[in-house]
């Protein structure tokens, strides 16, 4: 802390001078030194490898040790087949021992790209003297690799770098000692272990893990070991492990309570193109409007999760000074002020005229059960024209609404507008709820400028209430399916392109051309996407399946949680409908981020034989990771399984009794895999001790080796900060 309580200024990040140190190869005049100058209009100003056979690399040597925070790649002024589609960057204080700092790829365009390099270990910065760039794949298959320009930036102030260098040297020495300690203990070299630990005063692990090792490996006190594991679970020590596990989706069809005598009228009927919002405080889902296959609807419903019951708030909102019947509109909820806003709708071309094409805008007050018309025509108030299939998000904190995209409805036969036949799309608007004023933030643009955004329909847009950004991806523009993904910072008015959609990561991102419904969890920094059926009839039949994706905002990575892989088609006897909702479009999905539950209602199953068919099924979806209880049971199972195997060697009768009682209760007998594994355990009663050989433990007795392996398995559930080093000393020996 600086004098006067002021916080010390962050060290300045500046360009780091370097020289070319080594290279794998180069072709003709495309010398490695060319990457030192940025000449985007000169096709010869680049390094080009002589071949694309690995390993190809460049090693850069910095003028002096530095914390290398960023690497920037310059490019040629046009796309080029030799640009790096995939590459890795390594760094270290010497060229023989380097750490991976980055694994990424360049877009095949002319824009410079900057990447953040790993420069911290345990929140402590570490220095590099050498940087190694390893190309892995070029944009043109079987082309040599080219790098046009490289810039490194970071901190090279000796006052900052030297302490980091001292720490790094000490850290490496400490890790080497910990690897030795781990090796000595694994091989039961007790004297060497105790002597090294006493001399260096370096801890191999957290005291709790030492206690578990003592009880389990040295004393064979399995009951005490179980107690320590139970304490660890209750203290939340397995939480980090749980957060890193993949989700498993659990769909449940909701069958709401029915009120006697109401018949089918006590819940919303079949529909598509309706809208839903959720009040997470009261656990209430609100549903309004939609299209039932023959007409637009104006009914308004509330579903109470606690009561498991639908309540009809209004059979016809228009009669209560609310919006007329509609579909393909949008709604958003202000949970703080308990108000719902609705904007836009689809109108058939036969009923479009200058009066009907006005874009009305309504607000519903939940507490007073009243509608208020905020605007007869938002376009006249500086807002969007009448649109459908747009997106709308609420920023409760600043009391703002953001709406983006959607197709603008126009009258047919309008001669004066030469663009009338071409579809028009709405831009990005902000509505200040307090002042009731609209502001156009971005017009629809086909330009590829860094702040331009392309309008679309059927896209996803979400507001992250913590980092205050809108996230937009997917959608359609005329017959083009868009695959880009960008964020918009509402406070700084800045667009950040997360992915321009040109990278061919097929299978690693949600496919375009399918109806996507997305939700956001600001606490977990996750975006969830349910990908359903395509609206496009041609694309529909061959690939009918649901898939659920999660985007990790911090790690900038997609993962597919599941695909149903046409399960119903493959197994006609088993109805998919019992397990999960069938693929569809024009449905609605909302997410309760407090209770971590999704709700899905209705939609269009896209049956060509019955085009008017709509759905009225209602589902909840929970994304489940292994629970604390599951992990505790699993750990107890592993401990008791090992205890049983030890007993089986000395007292088979006692072991059999233990198997039937103590081990039996740690198995989930409803799980076929667990049950099968449990049934096979009995074979241990007929094995001799020589059947068990633990790899790499030939110098210690069998029991010690087996217990050590069990200990290493249990350690995996604990946070890295508590555990011994992951590697093994013998792995450092190269042949």
Curated annotation (Swiss-Prot):
Residues 172-204 form the LisH domain. GO terms for biological process: actin cytoskeleton organization; cell-matrix adhesion; neurotransmitter receptor transport postsynaptic membrane to endosome; regulation of cell shape; regulation of receptor internalization; signal transduction; vesicle-mediated transport in synapse. Residues 206-258 form the CTLH domain. One of its GO terms (molecular function) is protein homodimerization activity. Its main location: cytoplasm. InterPro entries: Beta-prop_ATRN-MKLN-like (IPR056737), CTLH_C (IPR006595), CTLH_complex_component (IPR052456), Gal_Oxase/kelch_b-propeller (IPR011043), Galactose-bd-like_sf (IPR008979), Kelch-typ_b-propeller (IPR015915), LisH (IPR006594), Muskelin_N (IPR010565). Kelch repeats lie at residues 284-330, 339-391, 408-458, 469-515, 526-578, 597-651. The modification N-acetylalanine is found at residue 2. It is found in: Cytoplasm; Cytoplasm, Cytosol; Nucleus, Nucleoplasm; Cell projection, Ruffle. Keywords: Acetylation, Cell projection, Cytoplasm, Kelch repeat, Nucleus, Repeat, Synapse. GO terms for cellular component: cell cortex; cytoplasm; cytosol; GABA-ergic synapse; nucleoplasm; postsynaptic endosome membrane; postsynaptic specialization membrane of symmetric synapse; ruffle. The LisH mediates head to tail dimerization. Homodimer; may form higher oligomers. Identified in the CTLH complex that contains GID4, RANBP9 and/or RANBP10, MKLN1, MAEA, RMND5A (or alternatively its paralog RMND5B), GID8, ARMC8, WDR26 and YPEL5. Within this complex, MAEA, RMND5A (or alternatively its paralog RMND5B), GID8, WDR26, and RANBP9 and/or RANBP10 form the catalytic core, while GID4, MKLN1, ARMC8 and YPEL5 have ancillary roles. Interacts with RANBP9. Part of a complex consisting of RANBP9, MKLN1 and GID8. Interacts with GABRA1. Interacts with the C-terminal tail of PTGER3. This is Muskelin.
